[in-house]
Amino acid sequence: MILIDGKKIAAELRQELKKEVSDLKAKYNKVPGLTVILIGDMTPSQIYVRNKEKSAIEVGLKSDVIKYPDTVEEKVILDKIHDLNKDDAVSGILVQLPLPKHIDKKKVIEKIDPSKDVDGFHPMNVGNLSSGYESSVPCTPLGCYLLIKKMEPNLNGKKAVIIGRSNLNGKPMAQLLLKENCTVTITHSRTKDLKAECLEADIIVAAVGIPELVKGDWVKKDTIVIDVGINKTDKGLSLIHI
């Protein structure tokens, strides 16, 4: 078994992005800017945003985090997004999810200019990805895709099994692999004999948040296995158990 070193690959990618940002600055005398809207004080969201800000600064982007209490009115958020859409200094907008219950996630996502939609959640970007057109792609499936391509550049004809059908991970992951001419099967909680599906796969991406879901005897030799997310168990932090 070969362990995929995601941290190493991510570091290499950040170096590539750093050069791209430097080239953009030299050519246009302008640095792309990322603005993140963070609502509330949920610890996981704060960690995610802090890591995003750190990575943005590392590659040379301008980074701005706008924080609101979880009591903020929905209109305040929508008005701020409206202003950011019109701000030429802002290249990308990201609203950290989840949102407080009184704020309509759909309204917030649809308010973001599709060309500045970093998460790729806007219906226009979702539709473009499904249609094979250029679009913003959700970051997590895009990261998984880049890891897979690093391990196997030629995915033509590979059989891929996606465990999970969420709009955030499963569905966009399937679209990315379909564009590479993979034969893609999306599985979920109602799938019969998940083990049999996995045993036929050249690529398995688990995106359901269940620790140790994919067992060692579910995976054939040389299969690429990616687990989306980290789960906390009695044994500590856990990835897929293989």
Predicted features, each with a name:
Residues P44-E53, P138-V214, W218, I224:
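Glycine-rich phosphate/diphosphate-binding loop of Rossmann-like nucleotide-binding domains
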Residues I240-I242:
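Conserved small/polar residues in nucleotide/adenosyl-binding loops
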Residues L34, A56-D70, V184-T185:
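Short beta-strand elements in bilobed, periplasmic/extracellular small-molecule ligand-binding domains
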Residues G40, D64-E74, S189-R190:
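Short beta->alpha junction loops
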Residues A89-L99, D104-K107, A201-D234:
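Glycine-rich phosphate-binding loop
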Residues V95-N156, M173:
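Anion-binding alpha/beta catalytic cores of soluble intermediary-metabolism enzymes, centered on
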